[in-house]
């Protein structure tokens, strides 16, 4: 389990997060929703171990983040930040392989790379120069890179693993957004990964998430199931914007402007 207890983060005298507590279970997709500046990315950074003052308040599989070496942490969780800048020319296969230092045999590394590329339907990009790809292609390659880091079969995994994604569908068209979230659900269901994803698209969250965290001005406004969170009163309080919630033909809520 990945948990945060009463997270408080200040930067330059400004409170970014106040008493934020969340819990992510293996096999669960948790979406963090909120307006710009709500603290969503900072929360993800805290959960990943990138905010030093928050480490004592975050626990991964029962252990405080402070007790993990960087190598052990890399094998237990993988992080995709909001933007990734690559200034050097790498082949796609080389980039995806970067997180696989713990695998000694090159043939095993290549098998893991191929598996990750196949998940996102980008096998044909394997020998392409990353810098020649479109923004959407680069986004899917970065997703393959972080997912490859955790693709140990569940029977061989020492402990549950966690995937932390910040706006992972940026630059992706409609079809690829849904393809990515189908992969996310597969990772949660088949590999029993816990997934935390920061999102702006409430309809993607409604369709694919198991649990929602509503963050407003650095505080948890509420959290719970999709059905209990995506109701007009809560959404309007979260975004200060009127909405309607309609039933999708397949059962999940669908949010439109009022």
From Swiss-Prot:
GO molecular function, one term: ATP hydrolysis activity
Localization of this protein: Cell inner membrane
Pfam families tied to this protein: ABC_tran
Protein's membrane topology: Peripheral membrane protein
Keywords for the protein's UniProt record, in alphabetical order: ATP-binding, Cell inner membrane, Cell membrane, Membrane, Nucleotide-binding, Translocase, Transport
GO cellular component: plasma membrane
Subunit structure and binding partners: The complex is composed of two ATP-binding proteins (HmuV), two transmembrane proteins (HmuU) and a solute-binding protein (HmuT).
Function: Part of the ABC transporter complex HmuTUV involved in hemin import. Responsible for energy coupling to the transport system.
Protein name (record): Hemin import ATP-binding protein HmuV
Organism whose genome encodes this protein: Hydrogenovibrio crunogenus (strain DSM 25203 / XCL-2)
